[in-house]
Structure formats: C-alpha cells, structure tokens
Amino acid sequence: MKQIINPLKGNNDKVPIWFMRQAGRYLPEYKKVRETTKNFLDFCYDVSKATEVTLQPIKRYGFDAAIIFSDILVLPHALGWEVDFKENIGPILKQFKSQEDFKYLQINPNYKLEKVYEIIKKVKKELPSPISLIGFAGSPWTVMSYMLEGKGKQDFKTSKKFIYENKILAEELLNFITEKTADHLINQAKSGADVLKLFDSWSGVLAEEEFTKFVIEPTKKIILKVKEVFPKTPIIAFPKGAGLLYEKFIKEVPIDVLAVDQMVPLEKMKEWSDKVIVQGNLDPVVLLTNKEIIKEKTYKILQAMKGKNFIFNLGHGILPETPTENVEFLTEYVRLYEEKNSNSTF
C-alpha cells in the first residue's frame, strides 16, 4: 500500500512525509538542470528535465510522495493567456480587464498540457512503487487573481475590486477556470497521478462571502467532477491563510485531505483530523535554523498528531535558501519518531 495513502485507508500508525516545493532551488542538482533552460515555462514543459527534477528529492530523501514538477500557471498559459516568468520578479501576465479578453482564451487547451501528462507518465514509470505521485493545479481563485492582477504577490486590491464591481463577468471567468481546472486534474489522474492537490495560495485575502463564492463553491465543483471519473483518487485541498474559514471549508467541501498553513493551532489540527486527514504544518523558516530547533518544533507537531489522520508537511513550500542537510535531518527525525512512537522517553 502506498505510504501517502495510508491514512486514507485508516492506517495511521505511520506518518507519511513529503514537502511542497521539494523539487526546487534549494537542491544543487535542481539548479544544475534548471540552468540548462532559460525560460521557466519551457522548463516545465520539457518532459526529460521535468521528470528528472521531480525524481531528484525522492532519490535524495526517499519521501513518501513525489509531486510533479510543474506550475499552477501552466493552465492559463496552455489556454492561450500570456504568461511569462521574469527572473527575480516572478510571473507577469496579460491583465484580464473586460469581456473582450475572453477572446484570448481558448476553449480547448493547446498541446502544452499534453507535455505535463507525458511527464506524469514518465515519472510514474520510474517512480518506486510504494511512492505516491501527486498531480496538482492552482485553485480557480488563485489562478484568476494572477490574471486579474497581471502579476503575483500583490495586495490583491485589483482582484477584489474587480469581483465587487463586475459580479457577472467575475463569475463567468471563475466558471471557465473551474471547468478547465477539473479537466486538467482528471487528465493528470488518467496519466497516472495517484493523488491530486489544489493550491489556493491567495484564498486568505477574501472575506467570508467572497471566500464562499470564489473558494468553497468552485473547489466543491472541481472535486465532484473529478470524483465522478476517479472516485477513489484522494484529493488534497490547500486554502492557504483561510484562518477561521478553514472550518467552513471542511464542513462544505468533500475533501479527503486538508493541507493547513503554520498559523493553524495544533489543537485545531487534532480536532479537524476526526473529520478529514490533515496535512502540515511546520513553518518553512524553521528549516533555516538549526537541528535543535527543528527537532523541538517537529516533535511538538508529531506528539500532537500522534495516532491521528495526519500527513507531515510544511505550512508552505521549502524556501530556496534551505540547507539540504536540514531537510535530511527533519526527514530522518520523522522516520525515527515513527519507529519509536511508543517510547515515552523519545
């Protein structure tokens, strides 16, 4: 049985471990491959290179899951939207402003997404059988906000002003992205992904009414559509920064796994783990410190979630400046805890 899926089968005696952005800039072997391709999106579509970097952290650390190397913005890019990645700046997109802009979006995605599915098939062939393969997409609100802002990591005034003032158009764009996201996830499962994940990086900027409309409702639609085709494929949802709205999300969205950020109290994680599998939530900055601090913070999480439906991960992605030896230490510590979790002196 695949380790990452163990909690889904009621087997919670072992703690599965993997990390968001586990294939990335903190790895010297990743940097070496990344330097061979100037354009980031071209790198994401390169079957050989994306396969190689997907497998790198598995070879180095033996995580319980590999997550396909891709990006949440490959979907709008494959649908014809202008997306570019500028070094030291991040994604730059054509800004969606009016009904006229729908003419730049294609009903059917172009060949680029086929490259993503090829990567999944290739990784699946090379991945050791006990290890799960995770496919993913950006959740509609996060992808939509990139399109409305024209760039990432803003204060989201533009996006929020747009959805307040243009309710019908905003809903039309949301529905379009929701439908295409579900299709993208279904195709990833068809290609061999064992688990699927939805990243809603910017869900935390919305008030409750908008959170319901732009996060809860589309996520629910996507999951129901995927489950019609793949009822047994586990789905992880990560409405990052949702705060108190995590509880509303759990109540209204039929997810298998809830990924949570580092701001969520351990008591809440324990409580929620009776309803769903909880994934998280070590602060990524802890991995920039030292072994004693890593051990202290990790132990608290493992003790709190002992015997619970739980997958160990970070509260967000591994930071580029993270020392590889700290990732190794953390992984080994979690493994050692598994072996000795009945020993009260551990």
UniProtKB/Swiss-Prot annotation:
Source organism of this protein record: Rickettsia rickettsii (strain Sheila Smith)
PROSITE patterns documented for this protein: UROD_1, UROD_2
Keywords: Cytoplasm, Decarboxylase, Lyase, Porphyrin biosynthesis
Subunit structure: Homodimer.
PANTHER family in the record: METHYLTETRAHYDROFOLATE:HOMOCYSTEINE METHYLTRANSFERASE RELATED (PTHR21091), UROPORPHYRINOGEN DECARBOXYLASE (PTHR21091:SF169)
Family the entry assigns: Belongs to the uroporphyrinogen decarboxylase family.
Name this polypeptide is given: Uroporphyrinogen decarboxylase
Record-marked site positions (Transition state stabilizer): 71
Single GO biological process annotation from the record: protoporphyrinogen IX biosynthetic process
Lineage of producing organism: Bacteria, Pseudomonadati, Pseudomonadota, Alphaproteobacteria, Rickettsiales
